[in-house]
């Protein structure tokens, strides 16, 4: 799991930023299956929004 923020003030929870996090650019574990098996707008969007493989895809 990657840290959400460089400052280390963010925590990841279920693939996205933990509730109450005061981060503007939060990034948690990327959903590689989502970007490879589904169509997403961007890898960055998947990394921010995916909680399970492909769950960020429409």
Swiss-Prot record:
The residues that the entry says bind a divalent metal cation 4 are 31, 34, 50, 54
Metal-binding among keywords: yes
Q: What is this protein called?
A: Metallothionein
Q: Which UniProt keywords apply?
A: Cadmium, Metal-binding, Metal-thiolate cluster
Q: Organism, per UniProt?
A: Potamon potamios
Report the sequence similarity comment from the record: Belongs to the metallothionein superfamily. Type 3 family.
What does the entry list as the binding residues for a divalent metal cation 6? 40, 46, 50, 57
Q: Where is this region: Alpha?
A: 30-58
Quote the record's binding site residues for a divalent metal cation 2: 5, 10, 23, 26
InterPro entries, sorted: Metalthion_crustacean, Metalthion_dom_sf
User: SUPFAM superfamilies per the record?
Assistant: Metallothionein
Q: According to the record, what induces this protein's expression?
A: By cadmium.
Q: Which residues bind a divalent metal cation 3?
A: 12, 17, 26, 28
**Which residues does a divalent metal cation 1 bind?**
4-5, 17, 21
Gene Ontology terms, MF aspect: metal ion binding
Top-level taxonomic group: Eukaryota
Residue numbers binding a divalent metal cation 5: 34, 38, 56-57
Instruction: Note whether Metal-binding occurs among the keywords.
Output: yes
Role of this protein: Metallothioneins have a high content of cysteine residues that bind various heavy metals. Class I MTS in crustacea are involved in the sequestration of elevated levels of heavy-metal ions.
Annotated stretches, region: Beta: 1-29
């Amino acid at each position: 799991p990657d840290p959400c923020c460089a400052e280390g003030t963010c925590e990841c929870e279920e693939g996205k930023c933990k509730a109450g996090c005061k981060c503007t650019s939060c990034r948690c574990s990327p959903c590689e299956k989502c970007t490879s098996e589904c169509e997403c707008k961007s890898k960055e969007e998947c990394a921010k929004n995916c909680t399970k493989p492909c769950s960020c895809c429409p």
